Amino acid sequence: MNRIAIMVIRTFLGLFFLAAGLSKVGQPMQTLAAVYSYQIVLPDGLASAIAHTLPWVEIILGLALLSGVFMPVTLAATASLLLAFTALTAQAWWRELPIDCGCLDLSGLHPSLAALTTPGGATLRNLFLLGLTALLALIVRSPQRSATGEN
């Protein structure tokens, strides 16, 4: 059961991050505009660095999740990124900023999924993804897996 759960969660998270990164990689100016839309005071150089590196971080995390390599580090990095995303979208939601989160737009799959790009929808989605990441970390580090030598 654990192997199936690990594979399903890893695949879901991996595909999500891979798609998110690929959707941004060729559009640094749109990503930069999204960074600025959160109205967080950042030096221009840092905002630009985020816009140019974030897609690649998401792609690397997606590939690492899909391949299952370096899972403790991969899960820690995934959780850290999701915590940062959650803090950003939550503050935008709290401040009622009328922005698009600048994240993966799934509205092409179904129009109702456009709500996931609002600050509130993105916050809830990020919390769900963070929960999946925590669940995956618990399953991967479970005593049964350690006792059988699986890691």
Regions found by a protein language model. Name each.
Residues 1-148:
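Membrane-interfacial helix-loop segments of redox and metal-homeostasis proteins
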